Regions:
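C-terminal lid/capping helical subdomain adjacent to the catalytic/cofactor pocket in oxidative enzymes
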Residues: 115, 119-172
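Active-site substrate-recognition segment that forms the wall
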Residues: 1-120
């Protein structure tokens, strides 16, 4: 697109949403596999327990990761696995009804770092991509890095490791 290529690929994931309920979960809870799964380059299915209460009283249950392209199908076995993992941590959730499940695609860079900066081959093209599941949370920092670079200002951190140029040899 626009004469540039980055090796950004989708990582599919599922989330379960419960009915509004009593406040059982006061903080986001991750199991010990979560960090390893986020950092993994394995294309196979990985699940780890993430349970988070919302202001509306619903509880979000995840997380799964799988590199299978843009396959948008629902996988009920994965949903069952996520529910089982969550209820093993929070047995009280066994009696809570699920409202829905949804899936999405996290943009993933093979080195697990976002791509932030000016394209080395297409002048004027700036990238902010590959943040995987942290894109919304990292958006302000990514925007600040790009703004500072465009304006020629020193930024709050060195963005060299996020440069799109790190993939030049990979994409040629």
């Amino acid at each position: 697109m626009a004469g540039s290529h980055l090796p950004i690929a989708p990582r599919k994931g599922f989330i379960l949403v419960t009915e509004p309920t009593k406040k059982y979960v006061f903080h986001k809870v991750y199991d010990s596999d979560y960090v390893a799964n986020v950092a993994s380059s394995d294309a196979d299915l990985q699940t780890s327990t993430v349970v988070e209460g919302t202001r509306a009283g619903t509880i979000l249950i995840g997380a799964s990761r799988e590199r299978i392209g843009f396959d948008g199908s629902m996988n009920y076995e994965i949903l069952r696995q996520l529910a089982a993992q969550a209820t093993s941590l929070f047995p009280v959730l066994r009696d809570v009804q699920l409202l829905r499940a949804y899936r999405g695609f996290r943009p993933y860079a093979p080195d697990h770092l976002p791509v932030i900066g000016e394209d080395s081959t297409v002048k004027g093209l700036w990238h902010s991509a590959g943040h995987e599941g942290a894109g919304i949370g990292l958006a302000p920092g990514s925007a600040a890095l790009i703004t500072d670079a465009i304006l020629g200002r020193q930024s709050f951190m060195d963005a060299t490791s996020f440069s799109p140029a790190r993939f030049e040899k990979v994409s040629q």
